[in-house]
């Protein structure tokens, strides 16, 4: 390869991938609720019903606080013992239940960052696992921006790439949601 020349994959794949990502974001924008943006406000709230209820972080923090020490595992092979604190996702779902679809609970939960650039999906029953947390603290201190402040997900049954940081939207759905890393070839379930 000559100096200044890009590898064939970078030359041909990056623009196509960028176009696919932009198209995917447009598609999601048409079918996913956009929180307070629709009302001309910030998208820093959560929306557990599709469409519907807007929640602030304070609405979530009234739920019981729970602490958990688990091993955080990265798919790259490293791991770390972490002390987490936050709200059980099961408590959140019980307090702000999904609207029924055809008389039954939706099957999936979709989450994305406030800017919509990162998004992931989960089975609803996995989100109800007693150790799945909406985290507000890590290692005895409030979450930092680097670790996903003000709210991130922790699932000790999943690899780290499924543990979304900076949650800006939560929606329930009966359709298996898009997932950022799955589109790049990673497993949708990411189970340990």
Predicted regions and their residues:
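Structured, non-membrane catalytic/scaffold regions adjacent to prosthetic-group chemistry
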Residues: 2-192
């Amino acid at each position: 390869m000559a100096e200044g020349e890009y590898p064939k994959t970078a030359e041909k794949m990056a623009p196509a991938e960028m176009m696919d990502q932009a198209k995917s974001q447009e598609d999601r924008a048409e079918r996913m609720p956009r929180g307070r943006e629709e009302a001309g406000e910030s998208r820093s709230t959560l929306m557990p019903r599709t469409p519907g209820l807007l929640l602030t972080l304070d609405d979530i923090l009234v739920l019981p606080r729970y602490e958990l020490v688990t091993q955080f595992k990265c798919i790259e092979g490293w791991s770390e013992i972490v002390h987490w604190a936050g709200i059980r996702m099961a408590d959140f779902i019980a307090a702000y239940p999904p609207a029924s679809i055809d008389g039954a609970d939706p099957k999936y939960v979709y989450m994305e960052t406030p800017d919509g650039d990162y998004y992931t999906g989960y089975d609803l029953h996995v989100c109800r696992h007693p150790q799945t947390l909406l985290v507000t603290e890590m290692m005895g201190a409030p979450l930092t921006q680097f670790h996903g402040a003000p709210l991130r997900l922790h699932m000790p049954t999943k690899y780290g790439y499924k543990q979304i940081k900076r949650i800006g939207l939560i929606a329930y759905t009966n359709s298996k949601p898009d997932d950022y890393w799955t589109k790049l070839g990673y497993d949708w379930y990411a189970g340990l």
